[in-house]
């Protein structure tokens, strides 16, 4: 069948930002025509302090994107890891968004309909995690991989990520380059989405093009799974606290589909959780197969 280019079920950035304002930052007050005070990420309830660190990881087995203008370089992924940490007095709190101007550009040019007075404040949101803090080396912790929604960001579910880490998990998230709203690489280069659209969200694309795009997402996860086993190449201390035998995955909307699909075909993933997952493109034959691992979906009845 023919698949729409913009998944339903809260998959575009407008709905992600609405989720951000109404759920992730639950204490926000949105008042039309008045200044809205956006609060910091909610305090965590677990026992562990949280460190976070960003990495550029390159997959030399794939091109950056399938379009001619973008397939000349290897696939680049910005990856962020959150982990239980030993925080020192010189460590600095991390921000929810590092590049406010790129976020403002994305919201404005993609027609997400979020008032500028709100979007301009997102860059000032502070998190509970500390940038580049030293990992807590006294234990090993289960690993969770996070996949964002269509046009989303790796940090979009920071509230849940930090809460999980505070209870003893390592969380690995990546921006799915050219499907994320934007990606800022370590050198400051910004890559904007090539799939999110403003007035063309209902444009119909072929199933072949859809699955070509989707394969970039699932192969991103597969590549990260491989790199987790070689993470000493990036940070040996973080690698040492990852329990590689206990890996789960979760995602929002399109990321929920990405998570479920990847979990079916990778034995390394022991469990899967989807937040309002968008499952329409998933083949019925796959859904009907015997599921031999915990698979959980939190969403609306008859949606997605």
Regions found by a protein language model. Name each.
Residues 85-90, 95-117, 155-202:
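Active-site machinery of serine-nucleophile hydrolases
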Residues 25-27:
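C-terminal motif of bacterial Sec signal peptides marking the signal peptidase cleavage site
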Residues 270-304:
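The feature captures the conserved acid-bearing segment of alpha/beta-hydrolase catalytic domains
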Residues 125-184, 281, 303:
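Short substrate-entry loop that stabilizes the transition state in hydrolases
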């Amino acid at each position: 069948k023919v698949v729409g280019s913009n998944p339903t079920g809260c998959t575009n950035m407008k709905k992600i930002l609405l989720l951000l304002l109404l759920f992730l930052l639950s204490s926000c007050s949105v008042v039309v025509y008045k200044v809205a005070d956006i609060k910091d990420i909610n305090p965590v309830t677990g026992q562990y302090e949280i460190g976070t660190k960003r990495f550029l990881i390159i997959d030399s087995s794939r091109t950056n994107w399938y379009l001619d203008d973008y397939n000349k370089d290897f696939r680049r992924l910005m990856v962020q890891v959150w982990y239980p940490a030993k925080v020192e007095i010189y460590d600095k709190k991390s921000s929810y968004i590092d590049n406010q101007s790129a976020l403002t550009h994305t919201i404005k040019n993609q027609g997400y309909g979020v008032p500028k007075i709100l979007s301009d404040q997102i860059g000032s949101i502070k998190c509970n995690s500390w940038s580049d803090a030293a990992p807590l080396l006294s234990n090993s912790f289960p690993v969770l991989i996070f996949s964002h929604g269509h046009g989303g960001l790796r940090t979009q579910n920071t509230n849940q990520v930090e809460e999980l880490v505070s209870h003893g998990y390592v969380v690995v998230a990546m921006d799915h380059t050219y499907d994320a709203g934007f990606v800022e690489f370590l050198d400051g280069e910004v890559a904007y989405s090539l799939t999110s659209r403003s007035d063309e969200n209902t444009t119909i694309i072929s199933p072949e093009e859809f699955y070509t795009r989707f394969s970039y997402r699932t192969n991103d996860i597969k590549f990260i799974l491989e790199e987790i086993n070689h993470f000493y190449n990036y940070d040996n201390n973080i690698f040492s606290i990852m329990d590689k035998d206990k890996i789960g995955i979760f995602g929002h909307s399109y990321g929920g589909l990405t998570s479920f699909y990847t979990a079916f075909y990778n034995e390394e993933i022991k469990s899967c959780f989807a937040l309002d997952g968008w499952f329409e493109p998933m083949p019925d034959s796959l859904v009907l197969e015997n599921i031999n691992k915990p698979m959980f979906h939190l969403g609306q009845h008859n949606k997605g």
